[in-house]
């Protein structure tokens, strides 16, 4: 399925490949924003709200490009990170949950790894002969 819908019909309720790609790009963007010590913008909040909503205009190519751009931005931010700031406090969300700079960077990496794995399994299962 092209759109970033939360469930692909034949997948038994599992998240679709499109959802994983959209979520991957969004989580990277949000975690890196918090890691910089910044609040989310209205645009980021709107994108978060739209993540699980089917959108036929989101093609697989556009979703993959958005994720690739997110990875490029993450790598650039990591390269520019001053190691002296890694234990600095950062705050997440409207509730301002305390976290460390390094904690957010690690969480972004772990969450991305998890969803890439889920994406690969989803695509393999969807492509399997029936």
Question: What do the PLM-derived regions correspond to, one by one?
Answer:
Residues 52-91, 103-108:
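Acidic/histidine-rich alpha-helical segments that form the ligand environment
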């Amino acid at each position: 399925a092209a759109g970033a819908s939360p469930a692909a019909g034949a997948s038994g309720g599992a998240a679709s490949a499109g959802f994983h790609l959209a979520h991957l790009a969004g989580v990277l963007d949000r975690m890196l924003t918090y890691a910089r010590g910044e609040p989310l913008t209205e645009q980021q909040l709107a994108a978060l709200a739209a993540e699980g909503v089917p959108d036929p205009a989101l093609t697989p190519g556009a979703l993959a490009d958005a994720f690739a751009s997110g990875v490029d931005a993450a790598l650039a931010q990591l390269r520019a990170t001053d190691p002296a700031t890694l234990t600095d406090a950062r705050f997440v969300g409207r509730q301002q949950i305390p976290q460390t700079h390094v904690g957010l960077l690690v969480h972004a990496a772990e969450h991305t790894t998890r969803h890439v794995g889920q994406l690969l399994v989803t695509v393999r299962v969807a492509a399997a002969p029936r």
